[in-house]
Amino acid sequence: MDPEQNAWTRRHMLGMDGLARHEIGAILDSAQAFRDVNYREIKKVPTLRGKTVINLFYENSTRTRTSFELAGKRMSADVINISASSSSAAKGETLLDTVATLQAMRPDVVVLRHGDSGAPHFLARHLDAGIINAGDGQHEHPTQSLLDLLTIQDHLEEMGKSSFEGMNVAICGDVLHSRVARSNAFALRTLGANVRFVGPPTLMPSEATKVFGVTVHHNMEEGLRGVDVIIMLRLQLERMTSAYLPSVREYFAYWGLTRGRLELTQPHALVMHPGPINRGVEIASDVADNPNRSVILEQVANGLAVRMAVLYHLCTGAARNSAQLGESL
């Protein structure tokens, strides 16, 4: 790829909506270079020495927060973790007041997870630092989408494909409350994949076809037939304010990914899940642990490399291609 075309020029990583193919490619190329670092005996590089990264989490998240913390530290950045429960936010401080406090610290990047959609965009308008959206309400979760893309890309050859073009991907479950579903729909469509939302009508956004350009299936068997990739989503009961389904047991009976339903997909189909997994609710244990089909643990491992890549581009404004980055590591 032409280095000029592979340049990353954005100040923030707020979402997958609007990112071009070459921008997604720049992150994935860099992530592949950083992945090698994580397999060295000494898993540390001086890439972000002297840079300050603040992880500001208003919602709990073991995987995402730990992944961002480790990503920053492995690149020698100074990393500060702030959780809402232990910060002034718990005492009534507004997000705008928090912005003023952060501005005084002069960080290079702020990683924000927040329960309100649009909160990272608010920070980007008021804070002189790069902002990474680590999940905002039901809006987007771009780094989860990027690690999903990297995981799929790793398996293109065994799937008999050279790119995402024409790939069939089913995103199944609680799509309504899922920021992961939204980010993946935007990204996969940009890369040329065909995306299906599969789930009960009560858990499907009304704007699915118009906004995301996907096809919608309310029958699990129909939605899974012939797909190359399955991305299962958990039921986000904490975001449900009314009865969206009769019972968890009935949900699994109709919408759970079982071995029998997996057989409806392509023989090479990948099983993915952003976590945390609810076994026996959206996915059966023998499917989640299937060594030939499940790549769930690969997703976790790739998350670290992707977040290193995003921090690298935002902190350095780097427009290097992957070969140049690899030489510098």
Swiss-Prot record:
One Pfam family per UniProt: OTCace_N
Pathway(s) it belongs to: Pyrimidine metabolism; UMP biosynthesis via de novo pathway; (S)-dihydroorotate from bicarbonate: step 2/3
A molecular-function term among this protein's GO annotations: amino acid binding
Binding residue positions for L-aspartate: 91, 179, 234
SUPFAM superfamilies found in the cross-reference section: Aspartate/ornithine carbamoyltransferase
GO cellular component terms given for this protein: cytosol
Top EC class, one word: transferase
Example GO BP: 'de novo' UMP biosynthetic process
Protein name: Aspartate carbamoyltransferase catalytic subunit
Gene source species: Magnetococcus marinus (strain ATCC BAA-1437 / JCM 17883 / MC-1)
Highest classification ranks of the organism: Bacteria, Pseudomonadati, Pseudomonadota, Alphaproteobacteria, Magnetococcales
